[in-house]
Amino acid sequence: GVGLAAGLSFANQKLNDGNISVAIFGDGATSRGIVHECMNLASVWSLPLLFFCENNLYGMSASSSRMISTDSIYKRATEYNMVNFQIDGNDIKQVIETVKKARSIILKEKRPVFIEALTYRQCGHSKSDHLVYRSREEEAYWKAKDPILQYCKSENITLETLNELTKKIEEFGQKELESA
């Protein structure tokens, strides 16, 4: 969690090892005290910490707009004196570039950074979640914005090549699991 990442970033700072820590959490977590406590602490202590919020528009089975008082989660970081970004979390290239930029800021300016990646949860929150709170039109819209398919299209990677890569990754994962 976020608290663990903050602790690790404190260790990174004390060791002066040039590493940063990354806290990855969903939009629902931004309403929890631990996130704000860690954002404050990271800012006060200038911790090498990247806060990466995956805003998938839903907290459990309710729209984020019903659970969060703002439509711009990333702007909350301004109050903690952090550089902050809101990005298209379905654009793999933009995510990579923004994370690289954030890492550079963290190391050069000695301050934490906050990224809000706007994305979509394709599946339910759990196995018992049947997604009755979402429209089929909404799901179709976001399915067309699938990050892997978008990336493959931008890089001219065919579906056949993607399927081959997926198979190799699954085989590798299975071998690793069996040898563990």
Name every feature range the model reports, one short phrase each.
Residues V2-E178:
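Glycine-rich ThDP/TPP pyrophosphate-binding loop and its adjacent helix/strand module
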